[in-house]
């Protein structure tokens, strides 16, 4: 039977499927969050950088008023790159917007520091238009702030996002608290097997974002995806979302359309033959140098991902 939740390295349970809120438009997020929680979603993934946490908070409030209990859901937010040396301040901003006393998981959004005193709260730039990066920042120092905020009770878990094996290898020897989660872009055209395997070895749970690739992604019509969908009588979307849960990862499905939000809760068991088809597809892309990463902000930094190094 397909998993509905996974146990983190701190003993807490994280749902297998969550609602993602990245790039969800203003005016649509509140209803999406409220509806999702009322039909059975248990995980809401957000971030300060997304600029819509006020609306996420309104959706949470509406769902709570309709009978959803705070203790039954799992809320994720992320510290943006201009706040990596001001973690408490960054978290407090998110908590105010969300209308919560705590989140269940706080992530480092990217292991980079953008100038906290720059010309923009989120995306400071230099006169030449490049991102205003603080080059001597050590992400291990930022993690120490994450560990400190964990002790305040304002978050139940801490983790990272967009961390490569290289960056985790730099972090782990200095970590008192091992990250509970690494949230990464993940789909059959970017399986990131190296980091997935490394995280499993270290007890770090994977959360997959952009599981369909991107809007209009060729993944939806890729031969193995279509073949499995036809065999099982399900949609290509269901195949791609189920791929992650069958790998032991939590998957974030993003939509503001009620019918799609509901459909994205459907996760099915994929057998060994199905997974082999998808893995062979990934391996073929890798052998041809055609792996596709859709999310890579222009920080000008090598984060250590093999497909970008």
Swiss-Prot record:
Pathway named in the protein's UniProt entry: Carbohydrate acid metabolism
Record: residues binding NADP(+): 210-264
Entry-linked InterPro entries: AKR, AKR3D, Aldo/ket_reductase_CS, NADP_OxRdtase_dom, NADP_OxRdtase_dom_sf
EC number assigned by the record: 1.1.1.365
Active site: 50
A GO term for molecular function: D-galacturonate reductase activity
Keywords recorded for this protein, A-Z: Carbohydrate metabolism, NADP, Oxidoreductase
Entry's Gene Ontology BP terms: D-galacturonate catabolic process
Chain positions recorded as substrate binding sites: 109
Domain of life: Eukaryota
Reaction(s) catalysed (UniProt annotation): L-galactonate + NADP(+) = aldehydo-D-galacturonate + NADPH + H(+)
Protein purpose: Mediates the reduction of D-galacturonate to L-galactonate, the first step in D-galacturonate catabolic process. Also has activity with D-glucuronate and DL-glyceraldehyde. No activity is observed with D-glucose, D-fructose, D-xylose, D-galactose, L-arabinose or D-mannose. Activity is seen only with NADPH and not with NADH.
Family listed: Belongs to the aldo/keto reductase family.
Designated name of the protein: D-galacturonate reductase
